[in-house]
Amino acid sequence: MSTEKKTVAIVGGSGYAGGEFLRLALGHPHLEVTQVTSERSAKLPVSMVHPNLRGATNLKFRKAAELEEADIIVLALPHNSAAKRITEFEAKGKVIVDLSADFRLKDPEVYERFYGEPHPAPEQLGQWVYGNPELHREDLRGATRIACAGCFATSVILALYPLLRLGALAPKDIIATGLVGSSAAGASASESSHHPERAGSLRVYKPVGHRHTAEAQQELPGKFPLHLTAISTPRVRGILTTIQAWVPDGWSDKDVWSAYREVYGQEPFIRIVKVAKGIHRYPDPMLLDGTNFCDIGFEMDVDTGRVVLMSAIDNLVKGTAGHAIQSLNVAQGWDERAGLGFLGLHPT
């Protein structure tokens, strides 16, 4: 394997997702970020927008029209923007990683149903690998088009996948509720992100019809009815998802444990969290700030056969930029953990 670093250009680097990819890439042993674009922050030092990167880079933002070629193009644009300009970006780099939802879905009709308009480049759908190494590691090897998985979808998919893959859930509705940090809404200000409206608030913002439902339905084995509800929380980072599902008669904790161990036993970023005592018995997104881990827990109701699954991630890392880096590592044949070694903080 060559030790020469791959050059990276980040398009839309002033937002939270692009900034998080930049943070991780600056510490990556095989990546060299050479360009970061932003229309609103052009000519400003990157550290003016991302103050946590002071002293880590001397890069300045440039306009996308000034984008030069790079080995890897990372698109951190608003949804529906990358698809409209994809041929422009394909001319700039061999490998493209998209952090938006533009290329995650394979079916243009499903895209239109969930996003409310026809896909701008339907011929592209199906050409991109869904950026979830836990499910698509082999597909990602050598991939040049990676569509990063959605954050809420990631928390749902990773919790459910082992049980569905092994046929371990009864054929009943699956209900997932996600408590989501404010950074998932992006860096642009809105009425709902205004401090007097958001601070201290727990607000249901998508009780039905969440767009990430389509991703989860596409990626998970089987065709169970799946229902997602999203609730905004006062936290900045993190998603804590609880999922109500049902196991076959006679199943116990040990059976659920065995399913997770069988599927995730060798996964570098999946941790099963189920401790008998203490305040950290189950997954907690506070402990995952800045990390690429997905912590998964569960509890059985033996009287009803209901199993409550819990998953926690940092929405900007495992839910976006970290998952993208992990996918890129697999695609390039690097150590899957490269650039993703941060273990989190406690207390925070």
Curated annotation (Swiss-Prot):
Catalytic activity: [amino-group carrier protein]-C-terminal-N-(1-carboxy-5-oxopentan-1-yl)-L-glutamine + phosphate + NADP(+) = [amino-group carrier protein]-C-terminal-N-(1-carboxy-5-phosphooxy-5-oxopentan-1-yl)-L-glutamine + NADPH + H(+)
Cellular localization per UniProt: Cytoplasm
UniProt keyword Cytoplasm, yes or no: yes
Cited Pfam families: Semialdhyde_dh, Semialdhyde_dhC_1
Annotated source species: Deinococcus radiodurans (strain ATCC 13939 / DSM 20539 / JCM 16871 / CCUG 27074 / LMG 4051 / NBRC 15346 / NCIMB 9279 / VKM B-1422 / R1)
Enzyme Commission number(s) from the entry: 1.2.1.103
Protein name (record): [LysW]-L-2-aminoadipate 6-phosphate reductase
Gene: lysY
Residues reported to bind NADP(+): 14-17, 315
InterPro entries: AGPR_AS, AGPR_type-1, LysY, NAD(P)-bd_dom_sf, NAGSA_dehydrogenase, Semialdehyde_DH_NAD-bd
Keyword Metal-binding belongs to the record: no
